[in-house]
Amino acid sequence: MSPECAQTTGPGPSHTLDQVNRTHFPFFSDVKGDHRLVLSVVETTVLGLIFVVSLLGNVCALVLVARRRRRGATASLVLNLFCADLLFTSAIPLVLVVRWTEAWLLGPVVCHLLFYVMTMSGSVTILTLAAVSLERMVCIVRLRRGLSGPGRRTQAALLAFIWGYSALAALPLCILFRVVPQRLPGGDQEIPICTLDWPNRIGEISWDVFFVTLNFLVPGLVIVISYSKILQITKASRKRLTLSLAYSESHQIRVSQQDYRLFRTLFLLMVSFFIMWSPIIITILLILIQNFRQDLVIWPSLFFWVVAFTFANSALNPILYNMSLFRNEWRKIFCCFFFPEKGAIFTDTSVRRNDLSVISS
């Protein structure tokens, strides 16, 4: 008996035959049939629009936040959020290439890195939102006790932890994504696809449960608890906080309004994240279940549109943030571009008001 026959029929590991006959999920590879051109144009238009809006929005938001004279922990975390969004949407051109070619022609290196970078940046986003909510709660407690905020070293350590943990948590995807030949439904021959190839089901289940719990459910719980605590503190001690601040009455009102506006903006960012990331988390879990139930069918086109919906969150974040906190800056840019004379007047009257923003606390 040849070694090959012995490998498939002998008393070897039980998962060897399963791996040979296993059908892998093709992710972005798909055979679209007769409507390939129309579908590809629609997909390109949608993702192209998301990419442009995300790129312009996040870059503008980065510039507006970075130009602040004083930047505290919240500002650093918000900058980190925009950087993660830019990294996440950087995968869009590669996704579009695969949607046009159908087969994976980008090579094994890109296959290893594409889903790794997307997963890592998504993890950075949710952890950053959790850190922002926690920092806001701590900031209010410190304000009541007259304590200063975290220093630059603490902020740098927090950002390093977020990126380091996210990189390690997503590392199995970098290792286990590989290019394999497979015949897709609607195709007449095998084509190369980039897919996730776990050595065994136990490892796949363990990682899925670990990642969803620690990178989605736990940060979500932290966000809910933090914002609930913020609301509780705000309602219970709003009058006492206003009376105890060592500022003029008008300045107290301004800071309170800005703090409420920042809280509302960050809350909207959190809500939009969970709404727009929950479908992809559910889809990934369904792909795992598909390994055990062959009657459960998940089409690559469905996966693509779920990912496109998730990409849209990176375009929505800077829009929500800019519209809520940088209305004056955008009015100034608009006036300076179209009405230079009014823009100069608006600039002079808005400098002091901009410097009072709570984001620098």
Swiss-Prot record:
Cell compartment(s), UniProt: Cell membrane; Endosome membrane; Lysosome membrane; Cell projection, Cilium membrane
Molecular function GO labels: fatty acid binding; G protein-coupled receptor activity; taste receptor activity
Modifications the protein undergoes after translation, according to the UniProt entry: Phosphorylated at two clusters of Ser and Thr residues located in the intracellular C-terminus, a prerequisite for FFAR4 internalization via an ARRB2-dependent pathway.
SUPFAM superfamilies, per database record: Family A G protein-coupled receptor-like
Positions bearing Phosphoserine: 350, 357, 360-361
Transmembrane domains' residue ranges: 46-66, 78-98, 104-124, 157-177, 205-225, 269-289, 296-316
Glycan attachment residues as annotated in the record: 21
GO annotation (BP), single: negative regulation of cytokine production
Tissue specificity comment: Highly expressed in brown and white adipose tissue. Expressed in perivascular ciliated preadipocytes (at protein level). Expressed in the taste buds of the circumvallate and fungiform papillae, mainly in type II cells (at protein level). Abundant expression is detected in the gastrointestinal tract. Highly expressed in lung and pituitary gland. Expressed in enteroendocrine K cells of the upper small intestine. Expressed in alpha and delta cells of pancreatic islets. Expressed in pro-inflammatory CD11C-positive macrophages. Also expressed in spleen.
Gene knockout outcome: Deficient mice show glucose intolerance, hyperinsulinemia and display insulin (INS) resistance and a reduced preference for fatty acids. When fed a high-fat diet, they develop obesity and have fatty liver with decreased adipocyte differentiation and lipogenesis, and enhanced hepatic lipogenesis. INS resistance in such mice is associated with reduced INS signaling and enhanced inflammation in adipose tissue.
Sites bearing Phosphothreonine, chain numbering: 347, 349
GO CC, one annotated term: endosome membrane
One Pfam family, short name: 7tm_1
Membrane topology type: Multi-pass membrane protein
Topology feature Extracellular, residues: 1-45, 99-103, 178-204, 290-295
Spans within the Cytoplasmic topological domain: 67-77, 125-156, 226-268, 317-361
Keywords, sorted A to Z: Cell membrane, Cell projection, Differentiation, Disulfide bond, Endosome, G-protein coupled receptor, Glycoprotein, Inflammatory response, Lipid-binding, Lysosome, Membrane, Phosphoprotein, Receptor, Transducer, Transmembrane, Transmembrane helix
Induction notes from the record: Up-regulated in response to high-fat diet in adipose tissue macrophages and in hepatic Kupffer cells. Up-regulated in response to either short- or long-term cold exposure in brown adipose tissue and inguinal white adipose tissue. Up-regulated by ADRB3 agonist.
Disulphide linkage map: 111-194
Family, per entry: Belongs to the G-protein coupled receptor 1 family.
The protein's assembly and partners: Interacts (via C-terminus) with ARRB2 following LCFAs stimulation.
Function: G-protein-coupled receptor for long-chain fatty acids (LCFAs) with a major role in adipogenesis, energy metabolism and inflammation. Signals via G-protein and beta-arrestin pathways. LCFAs sensing initiates activation of phosphoinositidase C-linked G proteins GNAQ and GNA11 (G(q)/G(11)), inducing a variety of cellular responses via second messenger pathways such as intracellular calcium mobilization, modulation of cyclic adenosine monophosphate (cAMP) production, and mitogen-activated protein kinases (MAPKs).
Protein name: Free fatty acid receptor 4
Organism the protein comes from: Mus musculus
